[in-house]
Design a protein with these regions (language model features):
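ABC ATP-binding cassette signature C-motif
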Residues: 1-174, 263-267
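Coupling and communication elements adjacent to P-loop NTPase active sites across diverse families
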Residues: 1-13, 81, 166-267
Length: 267
């Protein structure tokens, strides 16, 4: 049973595209790990799904369950950072909503509280969307990874380790396509530039005598030659315009804060 569904839509901040979403579907057992570069829109996405940020006119978000969001920025209370974080977590967990959205809930927690949080989330009865920078949490709790990468949300089945394996294959394929695109683009640009130079030289008569250049038919010959070179150049330019552009990929941050096992990993 799906508890939350969206259509595919784009989200802008002013005139800047923040991200493009595919159609999303969450069921009761969804355990989503949301990852991405700082500023990629993770918090914004949670707020859109939670209904606390206005959605675009073309967007459609249908939620069929109760929802609680645990925000990253907490109100100031007369407690330490760890106690404040724990207080918000307890409050959110007690609501037992069908969908819990948590934005970096491990902030300010010590090791004992991290282990406690991992246990609580593991046994949480509802669905989860979690923003973490900890590989152990992502591996222990998630069955799907949402990666905000290059202004698009990519979906990977499995935990963070599964995501890494799929990502390596995807990156190799993309890098090969990017290198091929650059080679084709460079080849066409070089060929076009050469034809332009040849066309400019075609009307010059420095290598023949003035009397030869005045012979009837000489000028039409060079003009015809120039036109043919220009047509070839235009054909190359058309091919260049039709060449599918492939952008150089941006790498997501290395996740290495494995606090649960206290080991350092590099994803």
């Amino acid at each position: 049973m799906y508890i939350l569904e969206t259509n595919s839509f784009k989200y802008y901040l002013g005139e800047r595209l923040l991200f493009k979403l595919p159609a999303l579907k969450l069921h009761t057992k969804s355990r989503i790990g949301l990852i991405g570069l700082n500023g990629s829109g993770k918090t914004t996405l949670l707020e859109l799904l939670a209904g606390i940020r206005p959605i675009p006119a073309a967007a459609k978000i249908i939620c069929k369950t109760t929802m609680t969001i645990l925000p990253q920025l907490k109100e100031r209370l007369s407690k330490s950072g760890g106690e404040t974080t724990q207080a918000y977590i307890l409050q959110a967990l007690k609501q037992q909503s069908g969908l819990l959205l948590a934005d970096e809930p491990t902030n300010n927690l010590d090791m004992d509280h991290l282990l406690w949080l991992e246990k609580e989330l593991r046994h949480y009865s509802g669905a989860l969307i979690l923003v973490f920078h900890d590989r152990d949490f992502l591996d222990a709790l998630c069955n799907e990874i949402w990666a905000l990468d290059d202004k698009q949300l990519q979906i990977y089945q499995g935990n963070y380790s599964n995501y890494q394996q799929q990502k390596i294959i995807s990156e190799k394929t993309h890098d090969q396509a990017y290198r091929k695109y650059i080679m084709q683009k460079t080849h066409l640009e070089t060929a076009f530039s050469a034809k332009q130079q040849q066309a400019q030289k075609a009307v010059k008569t420095t290598k023949i005598s003035l009397s030869e250049a005045r012979i009837t038919g000489a000028k039409p010959y060079f003009a015809k030659k120039q036109k043919k070179l220009q047509q070839t150049g235009q054909s190359l330019l058309t091919r260049l315009d039709k060449l599918k552009q492939i952008e150089k990929r941006q790498s997501l941050p290395i996740i290495k804060m494995n606090l649960l096992s206290s080991k350092l990993w590099q994803g």
